Every structure is written in structure tokens, then in C-alpha cells.
């Protein structure tokens, strides 16, 4: 989702996540109904199996990097061995295994976003929702993280809904772009077609 600040990107993402109510219509992922105003149906966020990464570095400073990533798994009915496996795998895939015992406060901004990404990855999501996750990083780190996000998506095959106001970020990361302005969808197309039109 691409558009200027205040155009409704984050609100739309929050509706997809289940954090906001719909005014009308419905939300589906594939054939799975998530929300429907007409049918008065609402699937709670914890049952949607979505990984979420916010713009702010959403990490718990009183927990280690490992515990930050393992935390959502501990809320599910998952064995200790499975929690350890998934957490270790997520840390490995985000290049955080060597800092697993450190505090997130010991990491750079990019490191903190990797922790949030690893936490979202550990739940084996059907869809990843990313709300301007790179906007507070310096340009060099932002570009590096773009490649990492794209590589993770290709490796695991989950869909990503990515919110940004940065056109180059949208062009580099997307298979399809939805352009928004003043709360309305202006265009949905491939990056190339949007660039050419």
C-alpha cells in the first residue's frame, strides 16, 4: 500500500489485522473470511495467523532478544521444544542468533527491527503485515533490510502487505502496488504499470 501520510494506509492495515472495525464490506484472505460488516462476522486478531511489524521498534527491553521472539509462541499451545526450534530458526533467518542472549537495547535500530521481524516470522504466519517498518532507519540500512525482507518472503512463500509512503521502496519490494489517496484506492497494478502510467 503506497500513499502519503494520512491517506488511510495504516487504518486499512489495522482493519486487515483485526485491530479496527469495518464501516462496510468484508475482508478475506484467499477464501477465508476475516471480517464482514454485512454478516456481522469478526475473527479476532489472534486467530488470523498474521505476523505484524510496526514502524516503531516494538521490542520489550526487559526481555532478551530470544525471549522477545519466543514470547508470542508461549501464548499458544505449543511444546517447549517447538518453541525453541521456531525461535532459533527465526533468529537464524534474521541473522540474530549471535545476539540471542542480549537485550534489544544493545542493538541498533536495524537490529531491533530484525527482532520484530523474527518474532513475526516465528509464528509461521500466513501473511506478514508490515507498517512502514524501515522508515526510521538510515538509508543504507533501509536498503539492506529491503533485500532481507524480500529474501524471507521468497524463502517462506508467505504474502506480505507492506505499507509505505516511499515510492522507491514500493517499487523495489512489490509484486503489486495499491496506491491510496485521501482514504480511497486510486490504482492497483504491477510496479512497472504504475511507473508507466
Feature map (PLM): residue ranges:
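ATP-binding Walker
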Residues: 7
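Conserved coupling/switch loops of ABC nucleotide-binding domains, chiefly the family-specific signature
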Residues: 23-26, 182
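Helix-to-loop junction immediately C-terminal to a conserved catalytic motif
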Residues: 17
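A position-specific signal in ABC ATPase nucleotide-binding domains
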Residues: 20-21, 28, 74
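Conserved ABC transporter NBD signature motif
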Residues: 25-37
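ABC ATPase nucleotide-binding domain helices that frame the ATP-binding cleft
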Residues: 10-13, 115
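ABC ATPase nucleotide-binding domains
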Residues: 49-51, 55, 59-197
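The feature captures the beta-strand-to-loop junction immediately N-terminal to the Walker
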Residues: 2-4
